[in-house]
Each structure stands twice: as structure tokens, then as C-alpha cells.
From Swiss-Prot:
Its EC number is 4.2.3.4. This is 3-dehydroquinate synthase. The keyword Cytoplasm applies. It is found in: Cytoplasm. Its cofactor is Co(2+); Zn(2+); NAD(+). It catalyses: 7-phospho-2-dehydro-3-deoxy-D-arabino-heptonate = 3-dehydroquinate + phosphate. CDD domains: DHQS. The gene is aroB. Gene3D superfamilies: 3.40.50.1970, Dehydroquinate synthase-like - alpha domain. Transmembrane segments: none annotated. Pfam families: DHQ_synthase, DHQS_C. Zn(2+) binds at E187, H249, H267.
Length: 370
């Protein structure tokens, strides 16, 4: 199979997202042209390190590139001040200079944290994303959003800092646990829902075989990245169109906070539930027919995914408390909740005039089904 290259057009800061199998084995040759000296610092997590760090460092060594690595604990809890500070201090101890390159080898947590560390280290060093999860390959590794979570909420501290290169090796997705693969699919399906009905229709047919079909998997990653790249090029810092990428995320972030950023709810699972709620909200507001949320729920169920609040184990707070968590969302403008709603599949738009009582009733109904 060939490697696909999708360019993120940002003028002098443009970069390529390369998608295909075997990219980790060729990482040295891919990264070498970026280097001023043959040395990189790698941030990863303990799970990814056990699977992919040695082959990655071997590929660098074959190209004459020296490397050092720090493996942080795996999981969303790592994406906070303590591990962020640890990563920055380690990069300083490794004497990473402004002209050097930091590599993020891992999923969304590592990509976000390492990218933010690169953004603030010496007021900005370059970094390369090597995403190892489906979610990171189709979403978080592309577009330059970096950051960490705080006690107040998710991604509230961070920076826009674009990578210099993204290497999305679709072969490594075969090592993902099925639950993590399905969670990443929550972000894939989001792209069809927000702006490409044909892609969504293809996913309804191809989705169940993505985990086993390399060609279909590459197509799904490529189309997702193409859509994200187009939107980021138009609106890098989320003043307008880029907000569409947050379809499902206003609900998702509140649910993640309510579940303590734990294994009770993975980010992609929250996105899938959030998309279903956003389409249900759209239907209740008279924006789309009931067929749209029903069709989405049926597809997510067919994929074996979490779809409703009742699919989240353990206790959840009240509708009022969830609304209060949403008010902390970074998408809030002038104190108003901002939702991505839809007039149908592939027809999403930004709305910041959604009546709070309709959202509250939606959440109350969803909680009542638990």
C-alpha cells in the first residue's frame, strides 16, 4: 500500500500528515530532513513504550539519529500539571534546544501534553506527532491544539502549536485494544456527521470491518484528516468553522469531568454519546427529522459503541449539575453555551442561542433511562 500525504495549508507553518503502514519503521528517514542536529527527545507513555518505542528508536538509529525517551503513565490522568511539569523539566535536563525537535509517540494524551511542552519550552520548539491510536490519528494529532486538563475542566490550559510533521502509521492500530479502537471511531464518524454525508454512508457499510481491513482503515483515516486539514486551514484558532469539529464535545467534556477522566468513559466514547445527544437536541429543536438521530444511534450500536447515558457505568450527576459543568466549557461565549447542531447528517452548524431548558429536559430524559 502507498503512503497518503495530506497537507495542512498554513503558509510558512504548513506541514504534511503522512498516512500508511510501516511509517514507524521508516521514521528516521521521515524525520531526518527536519533536524539541524541528529538528536531527538521522545515523550511517550508506558503502554506505548512497551509496544513501539524500541522499533521507533531503532528506525531513528538506522538514520544516524540519537534519541532519549521519557515514558509517562498511560491514561487521561497524566494530562495534568504534575506530569506536564515532569515532562518539561526532563526536556530541560536533556538540554533540548530551540532548534531541536520533540517527538510525541502515543495517543491523544501524549500528543496534547508533549505538544504543549514543546510550545512553552524555550518559548517554542518544533515537534513531530507520531499518533498510535485511531483517535489521535484522525483528530488530536492534526491542527495544533495542545494542552492539559485542570481541576476546572478539560483542555482549559494550552496553546495552539502546530507540529512540523505527523506520521500516522495505520499498522500500529492493529495493536489497539478493541475498546480503544471503537473509541477512536467516535471521532471518525463525527467527520461524516458534521460535513460529509457520503463518507458517513460509506462508514455505515465499512465501519464494522475497519479494524481488520487495512485498506478501509487507511481510507477512513485519510478522509478524516482531509476534512480536519481543510477546516484548520480556514480557521486555525477556532474563530468560526473550526468549532464544527467540536460536534458532540460540549456534552462529552461535561461527561468526562463527571466521570473523573477515568476508564468509565474514554474520550471517543464521550464524543459518540455527545454526537447522539447533539442530534437528539437538533431534532427536539425542529432542525432535523427523527430519522437522523435514530440512524446515528443504530450505526453506533452496530459498531458496539456506547450510545446513551445509560451505557456509562456508575453514578452520574443530575441534569442541573451536568449543565453547570457545560458552563465551564472553553467554547462558552459571553456566558452562553455553544452547541454544534445539525439540520441532517453532514449538515452541522454552530449555535449559541440554544435554550437551556431544552438541554436540561434532554439530559433529564436521558438520565431517566438509566
Amino acid at each position: 500500500m502507498t503512503v497518503d500525504a495530506v497537507r495542512v495549508e498554513l503558509g510558512a507553518r504548513a506541514y504534511e500528515v503522512r498516512i500508511g503502514p510501516g511509517l514507524i519503521a521508516r521514521a528516521g528517514a521521515e524525520i531526518a530532513p527536519l533536524l539541524r542536529r541528529p538528536k531527538v527527545a521522545i515523550l511517550t507513555d508506558e503502554t506505548v513504550a512497551g509496544l513501539h518505542l524500541d522499533p521507533f528508536r531503532q528506525a531513528l538509529a538506522e538514520a544516524g539519529i540519537a534519541s532519549s525517551a521519557l515514558a509517562l503513565p498511560a491514561g487521561e490522568a497524566t494530562k495534568g500539571w504534575p506530569q506536564f511539569a515532569r515532562a518539561v523539566e526532563w526536556l530541560l535536563e536533556e538540554k533540548v534546544e530551540r532548534r531541536d525537535v520533540v517527538v510525541a509517540l502515543g495517543g491523544g494524551v501524549i500528543g496534547d501534553l508533549a505538544g504543549f511542552a514543546a510550545a512553552v519550552l524555550r518559548r517554542g520548539v518544533r515537534f513531530v506527532q507520531v499518533p498510535t491510536t485511531l483517535l489521535a490519528q484522525v483528530d488530536s494529532s492534526v491542527g495544533g491544539k495542545t494542552g492539559i486538563n485542570t481541576a476546572q475542566g478539560k483542555n482549559l490550559v494550552g496553546a495552539f502549536h502546530q507540529p512540523s510533521l505527523v506520521l500516522a502509521d495505520i499498522g500500529v492500530l492493529e495493536t489497539l485494544p478493541p475498546r480503544d479502537f471503537r473509541a477512536g471511531y467516535g471521532e471518525v464518524v463525527k467527520y461524516g456527521l458534521l460535513g460529509d454525508a457520503d463518507f458517513y454512508e460509506w462508514l455505515e457499510e465499512a465501519g464494522p470491518r475497519l479494524a481488520a481491513d487495512t485498506e478501509a482503515r487507511q481510507r477512513a483515516v485519510r478522509r478524516s484528516v482531509e476534512m480536519k486539514a481543510e477546516i484548520v486551514a480556514r480557521d486555525e484558532t477556532e474563530e468560526g468553522d473550526r468549532a464544527l469539529l467540536n460536534l458532540g464535545h460540549t456534552f462529552c467534556h461535561a461527561l468526562e469531568k463527571a466521570t473523573g477522566y477515568s476508564d468509565r468513559l474514554l474520550h471517543g466514547e464521550g464524543v459518540a454519546i455527545g454526537c447522539a445527544l447533539a442530534f437528539e437536541l437538533s431534532q427536539r429543536l425542529g432542525l432535523c427529522a427523527q430519522e437522523a438521530p435514530s440512524r446515528l444511534r443504530a450505526h453506533l450500536r452496530a459498531m458496539g459503541m456506547k450510545v446513551d447515558l445509560r451505557d456509562i457505568p456508575g453514578d452520574l450527576p443530575s441534569a442541573e449539575a451536568l449543565l453547570a459543568l457545560m458552563a465551564q466549557d472553553k467554547k462558552v461565549v459571553d456566558g452562553k453555551l455553544r452547541f454544534i447542531l445539525a439540520r441532517g447528517i453532514g449538515q452541522a452548524f454552530v449555535a449559541d442561542d440554544v435554550p437551556g431548558d431544552v438541554v436540561r429536559t434532554l439530559l433529564e430524559d436521558a438520565l431517566a433511562q438509566r
